[in-house]
Design a protein with these regions (language model features):
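Conserved AdoMet/S-adenosylmethionine-binding subsite of the radical SAM
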Residues: 4-137
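Short acidic donor-binding/metal-coordinating loop in glycosyltransferase active sites
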Residues: 1
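Acidic carboxylate-rich catalytic motifs and surrounding loops in phosphoryl-/glycosyl-chemistry enzymes
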Residues: 152-157
């Protein structure tokens, strides 16, 4: 689940840090209030944030109309912070096209790093109609983002 929904997260992560461990947060960005606390307190060494789709198709992809504004706030928090971070998108057909990727690129322009990850059908989370992109399609999706985010890479292929 989403770790930033846990109200005790800052205290828990402080205990982990006190043990000498670095802290990486994986988040969907829907709780910018908690992210702001964690960034402000300097608890996080690295943040990996999911970007589900272009702003135009975010609600369609995530099933919530109010999610986008919270995710946009989290994007700005990360881009304005000193924390190291990445954005990442798990791409699949038909949700992610070159148009969507270009829109994401414009939205996240000059992000530190952005990863495209291929969808893998586990059979348990997604109903029918969603398919993985081919390697060539993934390469084209990456090319659509590169003019905006030069450090765009493919992961997991």
């Amino acid at each position: 689940g989403e770790p930033t929904l846990q109200p005790e997260l800052p205290e828990f992560l402080e205990k982990i840090r006190d043990l000498g461990y670095a802290i990486k947060l994986d988040t969907n960005g829907t709780n910018p209030g908690m992210l702001k606390i964690l960034l402000h307190n300097g608890i996080l060494d690295y943040v990996a944030m999911d970007i589900k789709n272009s702003p135009r198709r975010y609600a369609e992809t995530c099933g919530g109309a109010d999610i986008l504004s919270r995710v946009q706030e989290s994007v700005l928090l990360l881009q304005d912070s000193l924390a190291d971070y990445e954005f990442r998108t798990t791409v699949c057909r038909p949700l992610h096209t070159e148009r969507e990727m270009e829109e994401i690129g414009r939205w996240l322009k000059e992000a530190k790093r952005y990863f495209l990850q291929p969808f893998v059908d586990s059979g348990s989370l997604v109903s029918g109609g969603v398919q993985a992109h081919t390697r060539d399609e993934l390469a084209r999706l990456r090319q659509a983002v590169l003019p905006y985010i030069p450090n765009t890479q493919l992961r997991g292929i």
